[in-house]
């Protein structure tokens, strides 16, 4: 499974990360369809370089011709002028294998927790943290997720 490959590769590089998005919701018990695996890292070049290496080790390549150094140096421009919120990776031999590293969030400012899955302890953003992210994004799928997260947090789900 792609998630396990990524986590194992990140762990082998000693990279701190937080799983966010649809896979994180699934680990919190809120299952929904998603194509990609989303992560947040600490916003520093060394971490983005480790992620680039770790993802490359499992056959994933940046969708855009940019490197970790570019992301960190030009982050503000990418977000404000190019509407780029994530650094996307794909396995061109199997395009269903997709990973997004959000460049709008900093792991140092996030609340996370460890969830045990398949013999691994995966670092996941808390439901409250995911809720904040979803409220900021406000896309149609996010609005559905917001309702489900609030129900789960209130004990209704």
What are these regions (language model features)?
Residues 1-157:
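Compositionally biased terminal segments of proteins
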